[in-house]
Amino acid sequence: MPITEDTGLDRLLDAETIAVVGCSTTPGKAAHDVPAYLQRQGYRVLPVNPFADEILGEVASDTLVDVAESVDLVNVFRPSEEVPEVLDAVRKRHADRGDAGAAWLQLGITHDEAATEAEADGIEIVQDRCLKVEHSRLRG
């Protein structure tokens, strides 16, 4: 089951490095402003966007597999129909590297089947919640 209780959400906020799949270069978009907020809170934000070279002062990777650094949490800003592909990449990374043990799907983003498959492989999942809102609520 995806994490919904405050204790589990707060535990995921102990992450240090967050890969943001679908990170945007455009201020004013949630996919830019949420990662910028997280960066201001002290998280290392690693943007994943094949159409950008740099976002928020960090080199942007084309795919999650291309992120060289260890990843604690994957924050997803992609449409729900793309979630299976994104979570497959999280599962592969977790199996190959032992990191990326959790994925946080932003507000409005869900895919129960893909989430269940990822959980079966040991990935913790949050769906349909804003990481910025939950961080502010639990740690602000």
Which residues fall in each region the model found?
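NAD(P)-binding Rossmann-fold cofactor-contacting core
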Residues: S24-G28, A36-L56
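Structural detector of well-ordered beta-strand residues that form the stable sheet scaffold
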Residues: L46, A102-W104, V126
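Short N-terminal or domain-adjacent regulatory/targeting segments
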Residues: M1-A15
